[in-house]
A protein has these predicted regions:
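Active-site phosphate/ATP/adenylate-binding loop shared across adenylate-forming ligases
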Residues: 1-9
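Short beta-strand segments
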Residues: 14, 38-39, 74, 213-215
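Short, glycine/acidic-enriched loop or turn micro-motifs at the edges of active sites
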Residues: 17, 42, 77, 188-190, ...
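Short glycine/serine/threonine-rich phosphate/pyrophosphate-binding segments
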Residues: 19-23, 139-142, 192-196
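Acidic, Mg2+-coordinating active-site environments of NTP-dependent enzymes
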Residues: 33-183, 207-208, 233-242
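Active-site beta-alpha connecting loops in nucleotide-dependent enzymes
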Residues: 169-171, 187-245
C-alpha cells in the first residue's frame, strides 16, 4: 500500500484473513472504491467455526467502502444471498446462468485453451468473452473482475479485451507438455472449494486418462476428515482414472 504513488490509476488489493476483525481493519486502512466477495468457502473454518461466520468476516470489507460504493457479490453463493448487507453499499450481483443477476455468463464452454461464454450485462449489453484460463470457477472470477471494473467507469469492451490477455500467476494452471503427457501444475494452495473446482475443470480437459496428485488441505478443524473424504468422492465423480494422495 505504501508503494502506491500518485501516478497509479488502479490498485487491486487482496484482503486475506484467518480471524474475525481482520478484514475490517484492512478495509479501513485501504478505503477501497469497490469491494468484491467471490464466494464463502470453508477456508479457515477451523478458526471461525462456520460458513456463516466466514460470511460475516468477509462482509467486514464494507467497513471501508464509501457511501454508494459497488459491492460485487457472487449471486450463486447461498450464504451471500442470505446475507444482510449494509445500506451504504450498492450490491452488484454476478452469476453463472441466472439472467436475473446484474451480470451473468451463459453458453459456457471449455477447451484446452480456456473458457468462452456469453456475458449479459443489464447496463452494458451482451458480449462474447474468451479467457485463457480453464474451469467454470474462472468464469466466475472473470465476471467479478468485469463487474468491478465497469462499475468504476471503465469501458466494457476494453475490460473484455483485458480479460482475453489474462495471465495466470505462479503455480496456477500452468500446463507443461512432456512426451505426449500434459502436466497441469495447479498447486499454489488447497482448500475443499479449490480442489472441487480443479477436479471439475480436469474432467473437461481433453485427454485419454487423468492422473490426479492431491496434497493436504489445512486449517479445516473438525471438518478436516469429512472434507478430505468429499474430495475423494469428487475425484470419482469427475472421472479421475488414478488418484495419488
Amino acid at each position: 500500500m505504501f508503494r502506491i504513488g500518485k501516478e497509479t490509476q488502479y490498485a487491486v488489493v487482496e484482503m486475506g484473513m484467518s480471524h474475525a476483525g481482520e478484514i475490517e481493519r484492512l478495509s479501513k486502512c485501504a478505503r477501497p472504491d469497490v469491494g468484491i466477495i467471490t464466494c464463502i468457502g470453508v477456508s479457515h473454518i477451523g478458526n471461525l467455526g462456520s460458513q456463516e461466520n466466514i460470511c460475516k468476516a468477509k462482509l467486514e470489507i464494507c467497513a471501508g467502502l464509501p457511501e454508494g460504493a459497488p459491492l460485487v457479490l457472487n449471486g450463486d453463493d447461498p450464504f451471500l444471498r442470505k446475507a444482510v448487507l449494509p445500506d451504504h453499499v450498492r450490491p452488484v450481483w454476478f452469476s453463472l446462468g441466472d439472467e436475473n443477476a446484474d451480470v451473468c455468463a451463459l453458453s459456457i464452454q471449455q477447451d484446452e485453451k480456456g473458457m468462452s461464454f456469453v456475458l449479459e450485462d443489464h447496463e452494458e449489453g451482451t458480449f462474447l468473452v474468451k479467457i485463457p484460463a480453464m474451469g467454470r470457477h474462472n468464469v466466475a472470477n472473470a465476471l467479478a473482475a468485469y463487474c468491478a471494473a465497469t462499475r468504476l467507469g471503465l469501458n466494457a469492451r476494453r475490460v473484455i479485451a483485458g480479460l482475453a490477455d489474462f495471465e495466470q500467476t505462479g503455480m496456477r494452471q500452468k500446463v507443461v507438455h512432456v512426451r505426449g503427457v500434459d502436466v497441469i501444475e495447479d498447486c499454489y494452495n488447497a482448500n475443499p472449494d479449490s480442489m472441487k473446482a480443479a477436479l471439475a475443470m480436469f474432467r473437461e480437459y481433453p485427454c485419454k486418462r487423468r492422473f490426479a496428485l492431491l496434497g493436504d488441505m489445512l486449517e479445516l478443524g473438525d471438518i478436516s476428515r469429512a472434507a478430505h473424504e468429499e474430495v475423494g468422492r469428487q475425484a470419482v465423480e469427475n472421472k479421475v482414472d488414478y488418484l495419488v494422495t
